[in-house]
């Protein structure tokens, strides 16, 4: 998608409040990708993305900015926690798995796009498969009259199938079952083995299953995709997308920084993870199920709160690979108020829509919203700062009784005012010990 940095920031403003610096830096980084692709192949190889380090406490919008952009622009995106690589008992276990995860994300992205493009062909394939079970083909040598009758019956059945009249009927279908797909705990390295067994024709089998037609339609989608779509071109496109448009968001990078003031036995492990990350961020080749993926032009966005450490506590080589740094602002009551009112699908709108399913119209008056924001802000100041996530806890506590008794208010309008907010939350926020457990 060809968007200017200003257009990117404008899009983000609908979902993330404030954080202008972070939005600007990411918008420029993404626009530079588009600019790079307009250059000659020789020059493209030399221009590497400027990786970004985002510094800010939890709940201020670090992940949301990157996730929203990747989704809007159709980029392969994954989020991983750097800290998980120190929890396994030995240094840097499978740090390359983040690249394999990105390859899978790119593959799914391209597959979904191709399925959408070829929707009519896929639907026709599924339709014919189901019709074969409902009305088996006639044997050879049947009279023209019988063939005409069969054709008419088939078209009537097809119309019923398309209209959903047969959705609750039960049929027996054959679906392919791969032995690798049945075990979700197999490591990502098995992707290459999966491709080999497909070629030699083992590892998968046809399984007969009885199910409703509406379920059969979904079950046959994968088989239809395998038969109709060009799998090699999908892999090739996915590899290209992952290499040139992929974004890896490394959260909690501060947890693997070795604080100069805090030396403990985990420090060698933390530094080991940093050194394992280094070649991937610098640019290396990683074997994935879609081929050898070069990480040279993947955009890495690292993020952390850095409460107990500083960015300078990362090893110098890794610091140098994240030249763009941006500090995200903490959220005060004004920012929290905007978060509750401005975004397209704000938290208050979500709760209103949920209760609308119970035929209850829920509204919040402006003073009540300001009071909710103040209480959330105060809770963040007096306890751990968890940013906008505090709003979820506060609103859940506020609406707890109403959600429980929603059926009693069916057909009515319920307005949350400042008085209700003070009654429900005032005593809790004043009692700090209680607030720590509830808010």
Curated annotation (Swiss-Prot):
Gene3D superfamilies: 1.10.8.60, P-loop containing nucleotide triphosphate hydrolases (3.40.50.300). It comes from Campylobacter jejuni subsp. jejuni serotype O:23/36 (strain 81-176). GO terms for molecular function: ATP binding; ATP hydrolysis activity; peptidase activity; proteasome-activating activity. ATP binds at residues 17, 59-64, 251, 317, 389. The keyword ATP-binding applies. Keywords: ATP-binding, Chaperone, Cytoplasm, Nucleotide-binding, Stress response. ATPase subunit of a proteasome-like degradation complex; this subunit has chaperone activity. The binding of ATP and its subsequent hydrolysis by HslU are essential for unfolding of protein substrates subsequently hydrolyzed by HslV. HslU recognizes the N-terminal part of its protein substrates and unfolds these before they are guided to HslV for hydrolysis. This is ATP-dependent protease ATPase subunit HslU. The keyword Chaperone applies. It is found in: Cytoplasm.
């Amino acid at each position: 998608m060809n968007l200017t940095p200003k257009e990117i920031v404008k899009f983000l403003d609908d979902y993330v409040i404030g954080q202008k610096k972070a939005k600007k830096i990411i918008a420029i980084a993404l626009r530079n990708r588009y600019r790079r692709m307009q250059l000659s192949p020789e020059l493209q190889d030399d221009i590497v993305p400027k990786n970004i380090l985002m510094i800010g406490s939890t709940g201020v919008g670090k992940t949301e900015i990157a996730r929203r952009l990747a989704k809007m622009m159709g980029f392969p995106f994954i989020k991983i926690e750097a800290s998980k690589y120190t929890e396994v008992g030995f240094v840097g276990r499978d740090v390359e798995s983040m690249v394999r995860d990105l390859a899978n994300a790119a593959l799914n992205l391209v597959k979904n796009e191709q399925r959408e493009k070829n929707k009519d062909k896929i639907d026709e394939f599924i339709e014919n498969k189901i019709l074969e079970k409902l009305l088996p083909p006639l044997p050879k040598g049947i009279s023209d009259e019988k063939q005409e009758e069969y054709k008419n019956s088939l078209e009537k059945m097809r119309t019923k199938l398309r209209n959903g009249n047969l959705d609750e009927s039960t049929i027996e279908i054959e679906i392919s079952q791969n032995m690798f797909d049945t075990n979700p705990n197999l490591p990502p390295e098995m992707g290459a083995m999966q491709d080999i067994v497909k070629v030699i024709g083992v590892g998968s089998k046809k399984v007969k299953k009885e199910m409703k037609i509406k379920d059969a339609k979904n079950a046959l989608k994968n088989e239809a995709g395998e038969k109709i779509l060009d799998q090699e071109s999908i892999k090739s496109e996915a590899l290209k997308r992952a290499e040139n448009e992929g974004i890896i968001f490394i959260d909690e990078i501060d947890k693997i920084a070795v604080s100069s003031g805090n030396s403990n036995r985990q420090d060698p492990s933390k530094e080991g993870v940093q050194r394992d990350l280094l070649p991937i961020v610098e640019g290396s080749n990683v074997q994935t199920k879609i081929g050898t993926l070069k990480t040279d032009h993947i955009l890495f966005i690292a993020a952390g709160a850095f409460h107990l450490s500083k960015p300078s506590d990362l090893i110098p080589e890794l610091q140098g690979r994240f030249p763009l740094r941006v500090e995200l602002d903490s959220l005060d009551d004004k920012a929290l108020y905007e978060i509750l009112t401005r975004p397209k699908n704000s938290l208050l709108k979500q709760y209103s829509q949920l209760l609308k399913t119970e035929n209850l119209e829920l509204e919040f008056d402006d003073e009540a919203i300001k009071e909710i924001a103040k209480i959330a802000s105060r809770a963040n100041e007096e306890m751990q700062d968890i940013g906008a996530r505090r709003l979820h806890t506060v609103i859940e506590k506020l609406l707890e009784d109403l959600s429980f008794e929603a059926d009693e208010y069916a057909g009515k309008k319920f307005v949350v005012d400042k008085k209700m907010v003070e009654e429900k939350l005032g005593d809790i926020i004043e009692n700090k010990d209680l607030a720590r457990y509830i808010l």
